[in-house]
């Protein structure tokens, strides 16, 4: 299935007026927060294939293309919400719960609460809204793809800020993922306050 608005249309048919796409980034990282975004577009824009051309799963775009597309999304969206959950809370409550909290906070941070949600993978039963949860939603739904771009750009920028504060770990390069560079930094310096010490790969570096 190519990316489009099929999922949004399903929610419209079920009575939703405002539909937001929701996605997260950073779930599999060894360090840093998990970040979620919720994005809603005016209905007339969702029905205009030209207006939202180029929006796609953030993983398919270069860093430069994501930054440019994030600017376009901010200009066109009727609402954008963000949710950020720290490594400390991830360690306390687990990545699954942390991801849900980030997504719920993103939805509740929207300027207008939507009637329906298209969510990548996760279900949010705590929110009494119409929902469609689907695998690889960021490759299917324009709204979810937009959320994936906003979340990715926000988190990448945050990791760049962390890198400026403490360049020892190379946050700007690997964004907290378990690359060889990251593993070498962990071996040399040990875990930082940004590391998810509950994650199994960190066990070798935690006293």
Curated annotation (Swiss-Prot):
One of its GO terms (molecular function) is RNA binding. A divalent metal cation binds at residues 23-24, 120. Manganese or magnesium. Binds 1 divalent metal ion per monomer in the absence of substrate. May bind a second metal ion after substrate binding. One of its GO terms (cellular component) is cytoplasm. SUPFAM superfamilies: Ribonuclease H-like. Keywords: Cytoplasm, Endonuclease, Hydrolase, Manganese, Metal-binding, Nuclease. Transmembrane segments: none annotated. It holds the Pfam family RNase_HII. It is found in: Cytoplasm. Its EC number is 3.1.26.4. Its cofactor is Mn(2+); Mg(2+). Endonuclease that specifically degrades the RNA of RNA-DNA hybrids. Belongs to the RNase HII family. This is Ribonuclease HII. It comes from Herpetosiphon aurantiacus (strain ATCC 23779 / DSM 785 / 114-95). The gene is rnhB.
């Amino acid at each position: 299935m190519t990316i489009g608005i099929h999922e949004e249309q399903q929610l419209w048919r079920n009575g939703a007026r405002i539909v937001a796409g929701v996605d997260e980034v950073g779930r599999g990282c060894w360090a840093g927060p998990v970040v979620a975004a919720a994005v809603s577009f005016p209905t007339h824009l969702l029905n205009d294939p030209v207006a939202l051309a180029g929006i796609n799963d953030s993983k398919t775009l270069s860093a430069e293309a994501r930054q440019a597309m994030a600017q376009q999304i901010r200009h066109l969206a009727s609402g954008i919400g963000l949710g950020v959950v720290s490594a400390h809370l991830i360690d306390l409550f687990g990545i699954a719960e942390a991801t849900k909290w980030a997504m719920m906070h993103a939805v509740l941070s929207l300027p207008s609460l939507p009637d329906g949600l298209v969510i990548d993978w996760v279900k949010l039963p705590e929110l009494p809204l119409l929902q469609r949860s689907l695998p690889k939603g960021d490759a299917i739904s324009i709204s979810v793809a937009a959320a994936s771009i906003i979340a990715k750009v926000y988190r990448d920028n945050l990791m760049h800020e962390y890198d400026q504060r403490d360049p020892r770990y190379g946050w700007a390069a690997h964004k907290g993922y378990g690359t060889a560079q990251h593993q070498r930094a962990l071996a040399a310096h040990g875990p930082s306050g940004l590391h998810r010490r509950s994650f199994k790969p960190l066990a070798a570096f935690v006293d």
